Amino acid sequence: MSWSDIINNNLIGSGNVSKAAILGFDGAVWAKSDNFNISVEEAVAAGKAFTSLDALLGTGLRLEGQKFLVLNADNDRIIGKQGGSGFFIYKTIQAVIISIYEKGLQPEMCSKTTGALADYFRSIKY
């Protein structure tokens, strides 16, 4: 199964996630949903976000040109919100998984779906 298949089947296909990406800690995009227009700068910032959690709480994070307020950030998960949409970024051993939910989707289900994939990645040491 390819990285794109994982994005499309496990995240987008769940109906709980609007847009998603899997990145390396350096911001290299391993795969993303076709509708996720993440810039290189945004990918690098997301990939490195877990190295400066306190600063992130004060400055927020940009995705697709929109600034999101960071509501919570710990060593495993970052939660952001902007209007009726938001994101969850989960850290695994070798990657970060970004999931965005848009208006009409349940934030809790987006988090649960993304967290389950992150748990699976950790279980296989990825």
Swiss-Prot record:
Q: Is Acyltransferase tagged as a keyword?
A: no
Instruction: Please describe the organ and tissue distribution of this protein's expression.
Output: In embryos, expression is specifically detected in body wall muscle cells. In adults, expression is localized to a striking dot-like fashion in body wall muscle.
Main location as per UniProt: cytoplasm
Q: Name one GO cellular component term.
A: cell cortex
GO BP annotation list: muscle thin filament assembly
Compartments (UniProt record) = Cytoplasm, Cytoskeleton
Q: Does the keyword Cytoplasm apply?
A: yes
What Pfam families does the record point to? Profilin
* InterPro entries listed in its UniProt record: PFN, PFN_euk, PFN_sf
Keywords carried by this UniProt record: Actin-binding, Cytoplasm, Cytoskeleton
One GO molecular function term of this record is: actin monomer binding
Q: Which Gene3D superfamilies match?
A: Dynein light chain 2a, cytoplasmic (3.30.450.30)
Which function does this protein serve? Answer: Binds to actin and affects the structure of the cytoskeleton. At high concentrations, profilin prevents the polymerization of actin, whereas it enhances it at low concentrations. By binding to PIP2, it inhibits the formation of IP3 and DG. Also binds to poly(L-proline) and phosphatidylinositol 4,5-bisphosphate micelles.
Q: Which family does it belong to?
A: Belongs to the profilin family.
Q: Can you state the subunit structure given in the record?
A: Occurs in many kinds of cells as a complex with monomeric actin in a 1:1 ratio.
Protein name listed in UniProt: Profilin-3
Q: Which organism does this sequence originate in? A: Caenorhabditis elegans
Encoded by which gene? pfn-3
